[in-house]
């Protein structure tokens, strides 16, 4: 399968298709859950998940960045893998400047038994990956252990007092 980015310049009345196409050369690799985010510097991040089959027990969040999203011809960085798991919602930037990426690796009890083992059982949670250098490096920070979870879809919100909420649909 492929992921296609379409662009509208008239408020959504029409779209130019194929501004960006993500396609994996391996037909067994699935590309899904795209997400667009403009960071505080105006850089457009296009993220997606890749996995072998439906659930390979690892998945992976990939990104490509466009430094000038208002250009007529969008130029994208080479794709890079930033996290294990799936990211269905946008990152946030906290008041301290940390960039937080909500990801998840589905647990073995999700009803979708992983087809492979990667030693990531300690990451089968609703996770937070963080960057302290504006996205140049990103690492696992922590997780929430949601009872009776299956297909986690999590997001992070910073409250006025600086504490964080993780909202998870499972």
Predicted ranges, named:
Residues 1-170:
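Asp-box/BNR beta-propeller blade signature and adjacent active/binding-site loops
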